[in-house]
Amino acid sequence: MGKDKNPRRVADNEAMAKVRMLRTSPQKLNLVAQMIRGKKVDKALTDLTFSNKRIAQDVKKCLQSAIANAENNHNLDVDELIVAEAWVGKNLTMKRGRPRARGRFGKILKPFAEITIKVRQVEEQA
């Protein structure tokens, strides 16, 4: 097992960022991810800033990280970036319990999720 010998490659006009162990369910996180897919990054940042969802601030940090990676590591123009992909995955589930009637035990599941955001530079059409 272990780490792959070849890390994941991204195209020359792409950059990505990933956040793991977000304390929300993947279903709730996917609602926020759908909100930003395909948008220009400045519009996506504005939408996340004014979103009422609690997890939107964590997604905003991930998007800002992807933008910084594009600018610093890949020398891409920030004004021409769009959110090319934003996909959500399931992470571990914390298991907790609660005593119930007649000596039983109720299971409480506390899910975690992860999100990966890929930004791509597109040329402005005249």
Swiss-Prot record:
Keyword rRNA-binding: yes
GO cellular component terms, A-Z: cytosolic large ribosomal subunit
GO molecular function, one term: rRNA binding
UniProt keyword annotations, A-Z: Ribonucleoprotein, Ribosomal protein, RNA-binding, rRNA-binding
Biological role stated in the UniProt entry: This protein binds specifically to 23S rRNA; its binding is stimulated by other ribosomal proteins, e.g. L4, L17, and L20. It is important during the early stages of 50S assembly. It makes multiple contacts with different domains of the 23S rRNA in the assembled 50S subunit and ribosome.
PANTHER family in alphabetical order: CHLOROPLAST 50S RIBOSOMAL PROTEIN L22-RELATED, LARGE RIBOSOMAL SUBUNIT PROTEIN UL22M
Subunit structure: Part of the 50S ribosomal subunit.
Name of the protein in question: Large ribosomal subunit protein uL22
